[in-house]
Each structure stands twice: as structure tokens, then as C-alpha cells.
Amino acid sequence: DLLISVAANSGALLGFSEKIHYTHSDSLQELLIAPSDIVVSDFPIGYYPVNERAKNYQTAFPEGNSFAHFLMFEQNVNYLKESGWGIFIVPSDIFETDKSSVLMGWLKENVHIQAFLSLPADLFHKNGMKKSIIIVQKIGGKSLQAEQVLLGEIPDLKNAQKMQSFLDIFHNWSAKMI
């Protein structure tokens, strides 16, 4: 409820309150919402305990509990329009686990990975807790794979010069993409 309130207040301050629909639910149940042009989400890390529901997803593991962040990735993309954009905060090591091939196979069929940006290390107490931002575009419509996927690390937020340089690079990249 708190995150919904913060998001709604932020949307209102930006003048978007009429254009944004907020939903609070088990994010893996069937949602009664229309596909969106953009989805932004911070996926929790861990296992999803409702195996009966998880088996409806291609990113579910054949046995045992599946990774919640894999299932939520799939669910969020399912609710994107063709050519829609997903901006997701994911574990930095999402492609380095022994189960990553499950997600990678699904991603190749459903999205173009357009960017993968590591968040600054000083935001996390432990290296194993690091997160990154992945930007994807759902395949279909006018979607195109970027000629060059934007890969990098977002600099320390306190370093104004490096941050400005990063923002310039990101702006130039996004101008070509959008």
C-alpha cells in the first residue's frame, strides 16, 4: 500500500494522475488490466511458493519452487503491448546462476534486451545484493533490437562529472531508440 501511495503521489506531482493505472495484487495472478505501453518494476528476489500458479509460466522450474523474479519478469512482459517497454530492477547476477538458461531461453523469444545497467555498488551493503536495471522491448509491432545494447555501470551518484557523462551517453542512446 505504501508503494502504491508513493507512486500515485509522484504521478500526481508530475501531472500524470489521469494517465496512470496503479494495481495492488499478487503480481502473478491473472490481472484484469489492459496491456501497457510501459511497465516499471523492482522484482523481489527469492522463490515463489505457489507452484500450482507458477506452472502456468514458461520460466517456471520443472521441479520445486521457481524464482519469483523469473516469473515476475514473464508476467510483466505478458502485460506489455507489442513494442512496449519494460524497465526492471533485477539481481545483477540474474544471468549468472545455474538456472539462468530458463530465463534466457524465454527472453530470446519474447523481448529485445536493449540495456543492462548496474546500479552503483555503494548503494548495497553486500556485493551479493547488487541490483541492475534491465530495459527490454517486447517483440512485435515496430520493435527492433538495438544495434548495440547499452551495457555499463551507473556511476556513483555523488560524482557529478561521471554522472553527467553517463547521462549524456544514456540520452544519446535513448534518442536513437525511441
Name each region found by the language model.
Residues 44-47, 93-95, 123, 140-141:
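Conserved nucleotide-binding/hydrolysis micro-motifs of P-loop NTPases
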Residues 65-122:
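Conserved Class I SAM-dependent methyltransferase catalytic core
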Residues 128-178:
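Flexible, glycine-/basic-rich loop-and-beta segments that form/coincide
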Residues 31, 124-128:
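Short glycine-biased active-site loop of nucleotidyltransferases that positions the nucleotide triphosphate
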Residues 35-37, 113, 131:
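Local beta-strand N-terminus motif with an aromatic residue
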Residues 1-41, 46, 92:
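Conserved S-adenosyl-L-methionine
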Residues 21-25, 117, 152:
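General small-molecule cofactor/ligand-binding pocket signal
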Residues 42-72:
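Mobile active-site "lid"/loop adjacent to the S-adenosyl-L-methionine
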